[in-house]
């Protein structure tokens, strides 16, 4: 919700309120993540004992997690600060900050884990400290930029200021969080269906899921960069440009995902053999790669439409879309396909579900744009 709210305010040239909302957002993240970190710190023993950790292993878990929970605040705040930067139109700096954090972590890890010269090796505790330091550098960098660019107020807000400005973030953020929580549930249900076809099918499905995260990386990048562009134009009441940005992103993702599908199709044999020597698993990985990625473009349409709805402050529409895609189309289509045509039917069902939902998503957003344009005309 941070990017959508601040983008709209900046688009309407309401910089004063944009600064207040940005500050309220960072304070909210600080409070929520701080609370979760305290709870996590207190419950290290019971949680990991439930997970089967031995007393010897608990010592190492304490060394790592006690520092990780403290450092979690240093991760959450830069992520939120990066959303503010993206909302202002800067998409490069957030990438640089995250990349720098990764580089610092990679440099400090061997130094603090194994030691060097006067620096004594700390083992797994050193790994946690290296991660926390890398996140801390990112936090300092983000805060300096936000203050320097006048995108936040360099003080804590008064209680009344905080409550007034945080409401809009929760209005969009809570439904968006709910939509994100539904995806692993649906994937878990489909994984259970896949399990009926044996261990080889589960292994192939797992490999497919990892390949999907790589194949859809451009889609995920667009889902983060499109909302600020739409929000700013929405705030400036330039609805025609909102639709142009949305439609351009849709055409691009369909084309790029078609190219990615073609590449995966051509190299499916090679990739399958890289992952496994088992012939049965390899054949199912090939089956996955020659069917499921065909629907990634349609999936991208749904994902970008969800982002666009959030950007124009229609979070419930995005939640409804995600619910429909997962539980009215994806899970039922996969289940019916598996009954009628086995594992191939399940894969085809996933593609059909994404395709049908993509068409519905596009038509719904186009209708919403028409409503906004009519409202704009009537006001003028």
Predicted regions and their residues:
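Small-residue-rich hydrophobic transmembrane alpha-helices
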Residues: 1-38, 75-94, 191, 204-262, ...
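Residue-level recognition of pore/gate-forming positions within transmembrane alpha-helices
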Residues: 24, 33, 37, 101-103, ...
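Short membrane-interface helical motifs at transmembrane helix boundaries
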Residues: 35-66, 259-282, 286
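Alpha-helical transmembrane segments of multi-pass membrane proteins
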Residues: 55-81, 219, 279-302
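Hydrophobic alpha-helical transmembrane segments
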Residues: 64, 97-111, 119-150, 344-367
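Interhelical loop/hinge segments that connect adjacent transmembrane helices in multipass membrane
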Residues: 124, 128-131, 143-183, 371-380
